[in-house]
């Protein structure tokens, strides 16, 4: 059993944060909320998604797992007004999700969860440095780096967080000191990341006040922020690239 | 003789409602206004257009017929500001239309009406059901249906008007009861229509308060609404598709 | 030595006015400001650009010449907010320009000026007619002409300035009398210009109050207006086309 109602804009944003990683996902539904863990097809980026029941206007659920094509949901939500309420109900017999938005009733066939890549194990990482910054600052640095290169260095040096991209001839660097950051835990950290992935991942951060980055030396980065006004959370784990120079 | 002046925005909207059916049309000009009847090249959709002289700021005309390339007019009106006045005068000797918009004088060669498909005969149909609804509701249902399928069922069942589209696995349905509609004349009606055509036809309805649909059982649909603040009217007649299941 | 700070929007607009002519330019830097003279690869249009030191928030420079790829600068400025200050400093040793925008530090490799086409000689022309008009009027006429043809006649006849484009069947003409113009110096003038070039050149004039056109009979046109709130000036010299009819 699963029956829920949620604001359309809020669901759209939550789905968008997942869709940057994968197209088809297993939603793990529990009485306390919905969670997803997924890796991208190339095994470079992982998304860990949690949306608590308090994000919903109505929510009642037994434990179950459903398979969703995120593109279809995104498409359907494109019709909704931002203040519409989206009502969902699982029809277990037919394996369909009934979705009602502003008078329109959708009957969405679900995917068989067993055909979707299994939930990955989240590695336990010791990431010594932590940086909390405004999402718009992060996005701006990534956009600037894209103009120059296809990868970007991120690190902490003393009390300064930095992002740097080098092209064949040009270079861009952003440095933020402790006073420009929301929080900083100093630690040895410097890793190189693919901008292909970073660009997608930071897209939803533009409206986010606090994004937490956890970093190490040639280690994955953990990019982490609240969604749904604090009722949910998305974390991305992105593998580093090996520096070739 | 034909000489007229009209608000640019109003003319743009009127032309746009015709352009969804055909590119080249015969304008029938009379002292009381302008009318067009045209079918699309595939004989699936017909447009019946009327723009009374009261839609114009100035209007004086003898009976005549001119051939117009709607794409050219649309292009030229693209330069106009929405509050500009468009002045038109027919130069019968040279078969040109002189158009003046905000100081720019266009000389537009007219098409020979005899090279344009003749005005079609409008079939007399007995369409038992009639639905009056808000144009934005109609457009929204058609946009939702497009996500799912390339055709759409429209019908009346008891006191309910419904639109439904079925894809290979998914389905969308909008039901509107008598109290959600502006008016309803119940009657047996259920026909299937191509979304290729419906999408174009409902595009101009977004700003229209009242759209009248006349429906029957496997019969054409008549989609009908006012243009030019009531000084004109456009009706579309769209042939049904045969249901294949 | 070259060190300067300038409003991002102002620099963006100034660069855009140059970029319609060429991609790579030699900036001539002097204590009193920056100047550029460049011709397009086909030798049809010339741009003469001047940006005085008063356009800058800070400015100090010795005489020097640097080679710039305008596309790169445009790209970088795309990240800036309109009220950001852009700080630039020349690093002569490495032949790089250090650019700082809102905390982001770019290191931009400069081009070797000797690899860029030398500054052209500006021909001394006797252009008998002069027209001063609003930039938006000019742009509107050019946009209308594009719908009809790929070249455009511009001239002065008595006290009237006119622009005219003829297509195979259609024609558009704008006439502006002395009272609709900001200023007019009558003189024999009528020349034909390629709309490919005019379209680009008039793009920046949309926000410009006064554009001065200097014209002759089958002569180049000089299109001239202030940039940077009067602290700079851009002039375009466009060669005429030979009328083929």
From Swiss-Prot, chains A, B, C:
Entry's Gene Ontology BP terms:
leading strand elongation; regulation of DNA replication
Q: What is this protein called?
A: DNA polymerase sliding clamp
What residue stretch is flagged as signal peptide? none
Do you know which Pfam families this protein is assigned to?
Answer: PCNA_C, PCNA_N
Q: Any idea which GO molecular function terms this record carries?
A: DNA binding; DNA polymerase processivity factor activity
HAMAP family cross-referenced by the UniProt entry: DNApol_clamp_arch (MF_00317)
Query: Oligomeric state and partners?
Result: Homotrimer. The subunits circularize to form a toroid; DNA passes through its center. Replication factor C (RFC) is required to load the toroid on the DNA.
Any idea what job this protein has? Sliding clamp subunit that acts as a moving platform for DNA processing. Responsible for tethering the catalytic subunit of DNA polymerase and other proteins to DNA during high-speed replication.
Q: Which CDD domains match?
A: PCNA
Could you tell me which PROSITE patterns the record lists for this protein?
PCNA_1
Assigned keywords, A-Z: DNA replication, DNA-binding
């Amino acid at each position: 059993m699963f029956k829920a109602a949620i604001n359309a804009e809020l669901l759209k944003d939550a789905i968008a944060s997942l869709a940057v990683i994968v197209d088809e996902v297993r939603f793990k539904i529990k009485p306390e909320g919905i969670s997803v863990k997924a890796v991208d097809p190339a095994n470079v980026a992982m998304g860990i998604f949690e949306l608590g029941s308090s994000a919903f206007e109505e929510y009642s659920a037994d434990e179950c797992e459903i398979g969703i094509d995120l593109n279809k949901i995104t498409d359907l939500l494109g019709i909704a007004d931002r203040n519409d309420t989206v009502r969902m109900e699982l029809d277990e017999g037919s394996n369909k999700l009934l979705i009602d938005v502003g008078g329109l009733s959708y009957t969405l066939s679900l995917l068989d969860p067993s055909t979707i890549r299994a939930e990955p194990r989240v590695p336990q990482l010791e990431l010594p440095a932590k940086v909390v910054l405004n999402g718009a600052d992060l996005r701006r640095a990534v956009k600037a780096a894209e103009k120059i290169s296809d990868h970007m260095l991120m690190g902490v040096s003393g009390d300064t967080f930095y992002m740097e991209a080098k092209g064949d001839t040009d270079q861009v660097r952003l440095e933020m000191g402790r006073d420009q950051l929301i929080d900083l835990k100093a630690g040895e950290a410097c890793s190189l990341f693919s901008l292909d992935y970073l660009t997608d991942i930071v897209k939803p951060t533009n409206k986010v006040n606090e994004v937490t980055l956890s970093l190490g030396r040639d280690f994955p980065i953990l990019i982490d922020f609240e969604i749904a006004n604090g009722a949910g959370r998305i974390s991305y784990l992105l593998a580093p690239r090996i520096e070739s120079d």
